[in-house]
Structure formats: C-alpha cells, structure tokens
C-alpha cells in the first residue's frame, strides 16, 4: 500500500512538472495583455488570425452594428438603389431619436431633408443614430425591412451568429417604443468578435473608400447653416487625437451598458493592414472605459505588427518525400507535383523557421490517368510550432494549390490489362 502511495506521489509530481514545462495551447497563446471579454486581430488581406481570445463568444456589439448599415448603404449606391445626393425626408421616428441628448446624434429638423452623404458622414464619424435610421428608411422603406437586410447580408458573408434587431446598435429600450416590429423592447444586436472581424474585412475588401471618411478626425455637419454642429470622431486612435496610433485610419466604436466599451479598428503599416476587434474592454480595476478599449486595441495591433510576412513555400517548390504522386492506368506510375503559387503568411518575428507545410490531397488517391500538366491535386496545409493548423476567418486555407507539373497520358488497354495481370500475380506471392 505504501508503495502504491509513493508511486501516486511520483506521478503527481511528474504531472506538475509537465504542466510547467509543456504549457497547453491556451497558455501558450496568452501573450497579449488584452483586458476584454473577447478580442481578435487578423490580417486584413488574407483573414489569417494572429491572435484570438474568446473570439467565438456571442456578445453585444453596440454601434459596431453601423458597419453593416454602412455596407448596405455602399451596396445600394453601387446598385443604383440610392445616390449620395438623394434627399431623406425626416420622419417622426428619426426626429424624436435625434433629439435624445443621451444618444450620439446630430439633431434633425422634423420638416427637414438631408442627403445620403450628410447622413452617412454623421453616421461614420459621429456615430449619429437618427442619421443611421434615416439611411435605413431611405434604402428599405422601414427600419424593420432594413434589419432583415442586415441579417440576410450577414448570412451571405458567412456569419452565422449575427442577430440584428435595429440599424444602430442601440438597446431597443432607447427607441421610445418605435423599435422594429417583431423585436423585443429590451433587445440588442449581438455577434462574436470573429464575426465582427469578418464584417470589417468584407467592408474593407468591397468598399475600401469607406476609410476616406472613417479617418476624418472631425467635421462640421451642415457647415455654414443654423444647424451647424461639430462632429468629433469617437475613434481617438486617429492621428492627432488623444490615443493616436501610427497607421490607424478606421473604423467603428461601440458602447452600451450591455456591450460595454468595444471597438473594431484597422491600421496599416509597411503594406500590411490589420483588423483588431475588442469587446467589453476594461481597465486594470475591471472598469469599462474609453481608454480601456483603445489600450486593448493598441496591445492587439502592437502584437500583430510584430509579425512579418514570410514566404513559407516558393512557387514550383515540391514537398520532401512527396515529389510525385501515384497514378493508376497511366503510361507512368507517378506524376510530379509542386506548389502552384507561393505560400505567404504573417509569422512572429522570432519564429520564422517554426512553421512547416503538408500536402493535403483534394483529388482521389491514386490519381487516374490521364493527368494533365497544371491539374490541381491538392492544397498546402500550414502548421505552426505546436503542430496546430494556421487559422483563418471562416476557415479559409492559404490560397495555394498543388498541381501536376507534367502530363501523364492514359495507357492503352493492352498495357492496362498487362499491368493488372502483373499486379494480380504479384499479389499471389
């Protein structure tokens, strides 16, 4: 019995030692001091995830919702549904919301009309809620119909966890009983940090000109008129502002009691653009604040810009030990294969040699002749130093195909028959 107890003690000590010297993946990833309920930083070009923290948890997104409203506005303009010069006639709904001093707004006159351009600038720079409602009503007729468009577009983007109940990101309780029909009076828009990053990437990919407005530190609404109001950008990480960050040029803050202090930011340095999302950021005392969300974003971007673009495989490079693949019914038994285009990704500066690649076959094995030169046979799989596959938004893989580098013609029927007979005889011995 004493011997058994002694062995149990030894095993427990060994387990503790192993836990210390061999941290699990979660421990290994805890390298970014991000004080937030959820966070993610990705390469905007490829969608490669550089760091994620609780990034699949569905949380409140507050005014980050307006990025979807912006997307639908740009799409409507592109499709000719509306134009920048189209006038919006203020409704009772948008007018009453615009007069609520608790909310971010530019006041709208009840008998006034405003162009899409004016409303868009107020939404993008000042997060104006009534202006956003005006855009929604112009495009879809009602905010209810616009919300349906928001949810449909999210699914089209591959976002499965989005739940939009209004166009602004406000809690419905602030909409004075005029919230979209079919939504709860205390509901709020929700999504995961990963999905917010997908939305941000789609917006930047499809309508990069959005940054022309998002990067404006301040602008006068209706300058030179009695309605003139100074709009200061809520993104104070822009150049010349309180939390200035080199390369920052967008994109959208968000704050409600439910969502906390959140931010979807983007910055570009040395040709690399990153997207960082923080949700419900807090300070060291656990309190939410404007400073907290920007400090968390800074930590994410600093970490991300510590990565370097690295060519993991060159175009034409072959896989060691898999320079060729077997071919059935061909004039040759094997066909040479190689990477069709270079494989590039962002890797930490200190881990340039830590990544390796594998060939992931997409064609049947063995291949059956005829095999044409250039025929795709697989994809490149990239693994990190801990043997984990490099992760991308929406599960994308590195955009690198593996293809045949020669043609193997199909053998004639006699050769195929003789080969089958030879294989049969070989199998007897």
Model-flagged regions — what are they?
Residues 1-4, 8, 61, 112, ...:
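Structural motif marking the loop-to-transmembrane transition
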Residues 23-194, 204-208:
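Active-site-adjacent loops and short helices of periplasmic peptidoglycan-processing enzymes
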Residues 2-4, 149-154, 426:
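Periplasmic/cell-envelope proteins involved in peptidoglycan metabolism and beta-lactam response
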Residues 2-28:
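Sec-dependent N-terminal signal peptides of Gram-positive bacterial secreted proteins and lipoproteins
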Residues 177, 184-190, 194-429:
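Domain-terminus/edge residues, biased toward the C-terminal soluble/receptor-binding domains
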């Amino acid at each position: 019995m004493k011997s058994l107890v002694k062995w149990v003690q030894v095993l427990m000590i060994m387990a503790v030692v192993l836990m210390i010297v061999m941290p699990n993946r979660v421990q290994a990833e805890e390298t970014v001091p991000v004080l937030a309920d959820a966070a993610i930083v990705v390469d905007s070009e490829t969608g490669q995830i550089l760091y994620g923290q609780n990034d699949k948890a569905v949380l409140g997104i507050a005014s980050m919702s307006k990025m979807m409203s912006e997307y639908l506005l740009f799409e409507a303009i592109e499709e000719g549904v509306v134009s920048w010069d189209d006038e919006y006639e203020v409704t009772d709904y948008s007018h009453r919301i615009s007069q609520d001093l608790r909310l971010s707004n530019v006041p709208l006159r009840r008998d006034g009309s405003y162009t899409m351009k004016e409303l868009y600038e107020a939404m993008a720079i000042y997060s104006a809620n009534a202006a956003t409602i005006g855009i929604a009503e112009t495009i879809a007729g009602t905010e209810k119909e616009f919300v349906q468009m928001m949810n449909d577009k999210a699914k089209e983007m591959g976002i499965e966890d989005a739940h939009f109940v209004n166009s602004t990101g406000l809690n419905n309780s602030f909409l004075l009983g005029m919230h979209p029909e079919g939504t709860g009076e205390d509901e709020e828009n929700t999504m995961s940090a990963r999905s917010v990053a997908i939305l941000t990437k789609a917006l930047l990919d499809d309508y990069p000109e959005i940054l022309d407005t998002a990067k404006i530190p301040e602008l006068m609404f209706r300058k030179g008129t009695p309605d003139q109001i100074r709009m200061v950008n809520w993104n104070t990480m822009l150049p010349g502002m309180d939390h200035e960050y080199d390369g920052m040029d967008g994109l959208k803050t968000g704050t409600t009691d439910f969502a906390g202090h959140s931010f979807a930011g983007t910055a570009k340095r040395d040709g690399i653009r990153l997207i960082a999302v923080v949700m419900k950021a807090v300070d060291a005392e656990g309190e939410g604040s404007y400073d907290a969300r920007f400090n968390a974003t800074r930590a994410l971007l600093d970490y991300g810009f510590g990565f370097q673009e690295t060519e993991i495989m060159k175009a034409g490079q072959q896989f060691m030990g898999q320079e060729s693949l077997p071919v059935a019914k061909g004039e040759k038994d094997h066909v040479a294969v190689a990477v069709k285009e270079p494989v590039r990704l962002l890797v930490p500066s200190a881990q340039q040699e830590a990544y390796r690649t594998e060939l992931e076959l997409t064609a049947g094995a063995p291949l059956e002749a005829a095999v044409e030169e250039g025929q795709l046979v697989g994809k490149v799989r990239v693994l990190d130093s801990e043997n984990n596959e490099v992760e991308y938004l929406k599960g994308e893989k590195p955009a690198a195909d593996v293809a045949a580098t020669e043609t193997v013609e199909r053998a004639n029927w006699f050769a195929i028959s003789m080969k089958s007979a030879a294989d049969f005889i070989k199998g007897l011995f």
